Amino acid sequence: MRCLRKRQTIYAYSSSLTVLYLTQGKDWYCNCGSSTFKYSTFRPLHVQYGISKSMLTNLSRGVTWEVCWSCTCLYSSSSLGPVRKGGGFIEVFISSCRRSYSSWLKRGNSATMDAHVFGSSSSLLYCELLFVLCSRCPFMVCISQRRKSSLKLNTTLPMFALNLICLLRSILYSWKTFVRGILTFSFDVELVGLKFV
């Protein structure tokens, strides 16, 4: 498995405050045996999530994200026999928070979405987007539960429960950063998510 790391800068967000756009024009390559698969971001890579207006405003100010494309070689059946296809996932998080949470990230968390975000359906099997949204890294913000085929914001009880779990895990992870973060923490009922003010 090969991991290609690039940096992308947020350049805009929608008026609805639920869509985040990353820079276009980045090509990703997966080498699977003798085959090479190329994925181009021919349209903005976007993700919908529930988060506060103030957080999105901060994210829109040229914040640098680190993007990692990890290739996996998957197979599917066809009339000609097994066909090797390229696949992978993208890890997206604010680089300034990476060191603080690297060990926690390796253990995994629930802030993961599955989506077909770019590439053709015949060559791209899936993408996983892993987000860590931090405001001066006060503590972890989980923005959505894992969804297999949808990017729609879940504003139901499971979303509330997920945020509660993330908050409790943050307390266990680091008491000091939690205290610093809780001073500026409020709950956004409309978005049913974590909000920083």
Swiss-Prot record:
This is Putative uncharacterized membrane protein YHL019W-A. Partially overlaps APM2. It comes from the Eukaryota. It is a single-pass membrane protein. It is found in: Membrane. Keywords: Membrane, Transmembrane, Transmembrane helix. Its main location: membrane. One of its GO terms (cellular component) is membrane. The chain crosses the membrane at residues 150-172.
